[in-house]
UniProtKB/Swiss-Prot annotation:
Protein encoded by which gene: ruvA
Entry keyword Iron: no
GO MF, any single term: ATP binding
Function of the protein: The RuvA-RuvB-RuvC complex processes Holliday junction (HJ) DNA during genetic recombination and DNA repair, while the RuvA-RuvB complex plays an important role in the rescue of blocked DNA replication forks via replication fork reversal (RFR). RuvA specifically binds to HJ cruciform DNA, conferring on it an open structure. The RuvB hexamer acts as an ATP-dependent pump, pulling dsDNA into and through the RuvAB complex. HJ branch migration allows RuvC to scan DNA until it finds its consensus sequence, where it cleaves and resolves the cruciform DNA.
Residue ranges, annotated region (Domain II): 65-145
Protein name, entry field: Holliday junction branch migration complex subunit RuvA
Disulfide bonds: none
Spans annotated as Flexible linker: 146-153
Alphabetical list of NCBIfam families matching this protein: ruvA
Domain-level remarks: Has three domains with a flexible linker between the domains II and III and assumes an 'L' shape. Domain III is highly mobile and contacts RuvB.
Length: 197
């Protein structure tokens, strides 16, 4: 595997950059975060890469951080998610926002991404739930990382009780802002939400 490429940036296109190193120009497909601020042509650039080997092509994907590359590889482990869909997901926000959306079952946010419909968004949540570390993630204003972690567990519990990820997300969003951090109490409040419908 080619873990990283460092060299001179010689071209930037809509979906890739070209980095020259050792006389070879490497075409590297990248998410929006890389393409939005690649640096000046002729400047040195380093990307952490993932090489995808297919029958008809060898394709390099590049990322600003190792964490971003690891999340890309994790996304590829989900049935139905190819490299382009994974890039689109990474381009839809920061890695922290994406991990939090998956961990909390935010199917609506994931489904807004190009090439990711509602079914694939639900599959992402189902297959990656519990596999992503969300401890210490910066979250939306007014939501502490502790609340986000408890909500992620609550979402898993609701799904295991037979509710869809979307229903779980809606119930969690309806919890009062002053709801206690106790998981059992939050579960009781979420179930009360379903009973009031």
């Amino acid at each position: 595997m080619i873990a990283s490429v460092r060299g001179t940036l010689i071209a930037v296109a809509a979906d890739h950059v070209v980095i020259e190193t050792g006389g070879i120009g490497w075409m590297i497909y990248a998410p929006r975060q890389v393409l939005a601020a690649p640096g000046d042509i002729g400047a040195e650039m380093r990307l952490f890469t993932c090489l995808i080997v297919r029958e008809d092509a060898l394709t390099l994907y590049g990322f600003k951080t190792v964490e971003q590359r690891q999340l890309f590889e994790t996304l590829l482990s989900v049935t139905g998610v190819g490299p382009q869909a994974a890039l689109n997901l990474l381009s839809s926000g920061t890695t922290d926002e994406l991990r939090l959306a998956i961990a909390t079952g935010d199917v609506a946010r994931l489904a807004r991404t190009p090439r990711i419909g509602k079914k694939l968004a639900e599959r992402l949540v189902l297959e990656l739930k519990g596999k992503l570390d969300i401890k210490g993630l910066p979250v939306a204003p007014g939501v502490s990382p502790a609340v986000a972690a408890v909500n992620a567990e609550l979402s898993e519990m609701l799904v295991s009780l037979g509710f869809s990820s979307a229903e779980a997300s809606t119930a969690i969003a309806a919890l009062p802002p002053d709801a206690p951090l106790d998981l059992e109490e939050r579960l009781r409040l979420a179930l009360r939400y379903f009973g009031a419908r």
